[in-house]
């Protein structure tokens, strides 16, 4: 299991945020509240556009 952080773009408001690709809780957009990722017991169900995989968070 290789866990990573990903930068995603919300399909509703186009806000970009960095999330964990194996979430243990529902992840919502911090601007509009739309669900962008759901837990599945492993790799999450990402419901937003994945822009890039992040190696380091600045």
From Swiss-Prot:
HAMAP family with a match to the protein in the record: Ribosomal_eS27 (MF_00371)
Zn finger spans (C4-type): 10-32
Protein name stated in the entry: Small ribosomal subunit protein eS27
Cofactor entry: Zn(2+)
Cofactor note: Binds 1 zinc ion per subunit.
Biological processes annotated in GO: translation
Gene3D superfamilies listed in its UniProt record: Zn-binding ribosomal proteins (2.20.25.100)
Single GO term (MF): structural constituent of ribosome
GO annotations of cellular component type: ribonucleoprotein complex; ribosome
Assembly notes: Part of the 30S ribosomal subunit.
Keywords assigned by UniProt, alphabetized: Metal-binding, Ribonucleoprotein, Ribosomal protein, Zinc, Zinc-finger
Residues that bind Zn(2+): 10, 13, 29, 32
Family of the protein in this entry: Belongs to the eukaryotic ribosomal protein eS27 family.
């Amino acid at each position: 299991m290789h866990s990573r952080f990903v930068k995603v773009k919300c399909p509703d408001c186009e806000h970009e945020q960095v999330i964990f690709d194996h979430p243990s809780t529902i992840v919502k957009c911090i601007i509009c509240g739309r669900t962008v990722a759901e837990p599945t017991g492993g790799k999450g169900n990402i419901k937003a556009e994945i822009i890039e995989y992040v190696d380091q968070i600045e």
